[in-house]
């Protein structure tokens, strides 16, 4: 076995030859790969090796010897520790180009048709774009309760200062709740002992409606002086439409438990996306960046070229957002989603918007798709998929290939699984377009809309 050319805790000078999918710098020493957070292609840096594995190592920057013109001053005090915006040190326009290049690189490696990936659609204002904030409640070294964000790759809570991607109202509400916790000496959840009451404070905001939901995640069923907390929050923030107590007594990393108790309002808020109104409950999925989500959906719907004669399948439909966008143009839309609460919300959303040609089915996409096609003999003209990060399962791919819909639109939150799946469709479909959309500015995350037409 060849000797590894680097040692832990030793310093080296390297040139950054590329950036990875999460924005990390990549360097080589004697053909041995080193990943360096915060480094940019073209830079020369002095690094300290912090971890060595058999195939690669990790380094951290000690000094930047030659700086890239893509680098900018970081405007966030917790940037290095938080890890929420791992590309904040790079100028925004350059992050968009890097995301396009990352998707193009995957296309070139995986697909026979080396289609040219379109430039990433960025935001006009890439600040304060998130409509959902999840603040863990923890204890600092002095024993005081704090709220904030988890330090990168740990469960240490970094006290919240000013986050440039969250909605400012979310921070204000969470800080007010924290003051109440401190003043009333209410216990805070400890992962090691599995004791203590407050776990998380989650805020959801309707960007267009300004309605706010506050979710108090607790390891128990009662909050001391609960009525007083509700009064403080609702008087100070009149936009709060509902406050929900979420019961999570499990020893788990999952933030929300399954039981919700409304302690103010009716347990949901509404927001507008395009011309539609959507009902958002504590457990329902709703795009975190609705400004970009609207652009994403419009691209997908436009690409599908839906007509009044078309039957459409919307797989992994969530709360029915894109289903409703498509229903306007289609004869019938079938939305499929495994999360039952999301399907309840989807049905409610169809009712709110007077859409009567969309049917929503709760169940495993693989099984429901199989049933629609092979038992009910419903053959779609258009299939729209928006799967989780793991991509499409083989059974769903086989069923789509079996029915060969004329038009097929794949919305993806993971370019690696997108191109893996596209390779399986290439014999039958032509990949017409791949459009990256920047849903999470200054992070390594990129969504793509991919349009496929039957050959």
Task: Please state what every model-predicted region is.
Residues 50-52, 136-140, 204-208, 453-455:
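Short beta-strand micro-motifs enriched in acidic
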